[in-house]
Structure formats: C-alpha cells, structure tokens
C-alpha cells in the first residue's frame, strides 16, 4: 500500500469517529482550566501564609468565608505540602486529555480506567475537604469550593465517557441501561442535585453570616 492509498483511507474515516464526545470533553476542558486557575490562586495563598500566617488574604471576607483560616488548617496540607499543589499537577493532565480527545486521539481503555480511578480519589478527597471545612474548621474557602465543583464536573464527564464507551467492561444489560440514562441527562441531573445539596448546606449554616443577617 503506497502513501497515496493510505491518505485516501485516512480521509475516508468519518470525522465523528475521530472526535467522540466533543461536548463532554469540552466540559472537561473548561472545568479543568477553571480548576487550574483556582489551584494556582490557592498555591499562591499557601506561599503567602507560609511566610506570614497572619496575612490578610483577599478572600478573608468574614467569619464564614475565610481562606486564611482554611489554609492554615492541617487539612489544607494533608500530605505535608499544600493540597493546591496537587491541582497544579492534575489539572494540566486533564487539560491535555481533553484537548487530545477533541483533536481525535483515541486513548486505550487502561489509560481511561486509570484516569477514572485517579479522579475518583480526587473526587472523594475534594468532598472530604468540604466536610472538614464545614463541620470541623468552621469556615469556607471560595476557591476550594470552586475546585470541589470543577472536580465533580470532570469526574462525572470522564465517567460518562467511560460508561458510554464501556471502558469499564460492564455487562451488556447494565451498560445499555446506564447508557440510556446518560443520554437522557441523568448525569447532569445528578451533578445539579449534588450542587444543590452543597448550596443548601452552606445556606443553612452560614446564610445569615454570608448575607449579613
């Protein structure tokens, strides 16, 4: 087969086959970019707090909204360094995956499964941090909340791709049922419910402080 025939065959591949899930990967790209920005801000704040623990950060608004209080807690450096540094590592990887997928790259199943496991850990970690901030630390960090939101959207987006493509190796009937639900918007509804619960929790505990009651 000569180069001309190869070029003809490649041109004959449908564009849709080269670019699967464009909407989902676009959502993943936007979310990871926002998450990277939030991680960068938190990383800078962590350096500032390390140099001056009494520094007045821009997001130290009141008793309920205080990045400084959260940033000085042991939970903010669970592994011995600021948690935000993990975002500086993880988010560029997600951005690369999303851009490559939008460009037509097809990743092997093991790679996407590994990414799903890693982001599952990140997802659980984000909500553990929210729990700690809400129930233990007693203050909220806007940038941390933003990372919780973007981590959720990226995790669900990746899960959607892995379920629809059956990278998880699900039984046929289960795969079909989950795929029908996803195409009907079950994942979007699930994310909205999670965000509504978070908003409700914040309003119940901190609403009077946040809104000046």
Model-inferred region functions:
Residues 71-93, 140-152:
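Membrane-interface loop-to-helix entry segments
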Residues 22-50, 196-203:
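N-terminal signal-anchor transmembrane alpha helix
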Residues 81-103, 121, 125:
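Hydrophobic alpha-helical transmembrane segments
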Residues 2-22, 165-185:
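Membrane-interfacial, low-structure loops and terminal tails that flank and connect transmembrane helices
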Residues 47-82:
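Extracytosolic (periplasmic/ER-lumenal) interhelical loops and adjacent juxtamembrane/interface segments
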Residues 2-3, 32, 89-95, 147-165, ...:
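Hydrophobic cores of alpha-helical transmembrane segments in multi-pass inner/ER membrane proteins
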Residues 106, 130-142:
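Membrane-interface helix caps and helix-loop-helix hairpins in membrane proteins
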Residues 199-213:
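Juxtamembrane boundary at the C-terminal end of a transmembrane helix
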């Amino acid at each position: 087969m000569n180069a001309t025939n190869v070029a003809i065959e490649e041109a004959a591949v449908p564009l849709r086959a080269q670019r699967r899930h464009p909407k989902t990967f676009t959502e993943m790209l936007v979310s990871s970019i926002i998450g990277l920005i939030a991680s960068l801000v938190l990383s800078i704040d962590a350096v500032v707090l390390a140099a001056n623990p009494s520094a007045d950060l821009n997001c130290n608004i009141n008793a309920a909204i205080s990045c400084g209080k959260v940033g000085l807690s042991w939970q903010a450096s669970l592994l011995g360094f600021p948690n935000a540094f993990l975002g500086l590592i993880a988010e560029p990887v997600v951005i690369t995956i999303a851009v490559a997928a939008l460009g037509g790259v097809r990743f092997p199943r093991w790679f996407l499964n590994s990414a799903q496991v890693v982001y599952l850990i990140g997802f659980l970690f984000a909500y553990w941090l929210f729990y700690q901030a809400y129930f233990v630390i007693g203050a909220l960090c806007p940038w941390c909340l933003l990372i919780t939101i973007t981590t959720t959207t990226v995790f669900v987006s990746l899960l959607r791709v892995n379920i629809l493509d059956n990278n998880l190796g699900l039984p046929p009937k289960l795969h079909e049922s989950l795929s029908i639900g996803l195409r009907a918007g079950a994942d979007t509804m699930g994310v909205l419910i999670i965000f509504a619960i978070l908003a409700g929790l914040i309003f119940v505990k901190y609403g009077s402080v946040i809104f000046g009651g």
